[in-house]
Amino acid sequence: SGLPNGARIEIEYSDETDGDGNLIDQRQRDTYIARGDGRERFCNKFNHHAFRYAEVRGLAQRPRREDFRALAIHTDYRPEATFTSSDSDLNAIHDMIAHTLRCLAYNGYMVDCPHLERAGYGGDGNSSTEILQTLCGAAPLYRNWVQAWDDAMRPGGSLPHVAPNAGAGGGGPYWCGFIVMAPWQTWLNYGDRTLVDRHYPAMREWMGYVERYMKDGLLTRWPDTPYRDWFLGDWLAPHGVDTGNEASVSLVNNCFVSDCYARMAQMARLTGHDDEAAAFEARREALNRTIHARFYDPATQTYATGSQLDMTYPMLVGATPDSLRAGVEQRLFR
């Protein structure tokens, strides 16, 4: 109250401050022009902000705490699981994960972060699907999001790294392959085969696109496009995004393709495409043999760079022969 007509009030939001307590600029701002009728009230109906701190500029006097109210928004999914233990650290980790999922799930899909890009990256989706679907009844979210991926597919099966696809986003095969993994996980976790039945043709088309970029039995880098950048492998390596080692990038991406072949074979059988199931399984077995032959060093019992992911992924997808598995595990643990 008490603001003259035309007074300009600015509110800046951030989830970080610098050493002096100043907000770090995250380009989250609202501007309000006062009516001057003594009944000023502002609620942004067209945007949201993710923040821990807010700074108000343009008021003639210090506002009261009760003058402000923050409203949390998120997808209306149902909590389906709880976790408690005698370990306060584990309880805190669980609670932080649950809160993070609430912050990332809105607009009917998951985003990478709620304050900067706000984009539905497939890599973030693949890495969070199992935990979100374990904690929550979120099948409607995945029905909406997988449809966005299907809608974003280009002629010939090419996919972006982000859906809905408003522009280019960085990633790799693990991002595009959300269209395979999300329907599979939704059926596995919820017993809901709607996405498998509806999007199996799109999954099959994307696998065909992948195969057009295979050379000597391995997936190679596909081109950047106006809607897709990069060809990442392990983007969560301990020392940063591991894009510098081509062997690691190739190993990780081909292991993911192997995993996609396995899921496609299972979903092909589920949908009555038995001949296609056998073909996908044969391609998986051939790819696994090539992965092992190309990236395994028998002298050191390591794959590619010997990083944790390079060592574990071939075992997870079945590329490591049973006779060598114990040695690879021992080398990993050392």
Label every PLM stretch briefly.
Residues S1-P114, G123-D124, P140-R143, P160-P164, ...:
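Extracellular/oxidizing-compartment recognition motifs
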Residues E117:
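Phosphate-binding glycine-rich loops and their immediate beta-loop-alpha structural context
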Residues G120-R334:
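Active-site core of glycosidic bond-cleaving carbohydrate-active enzymes
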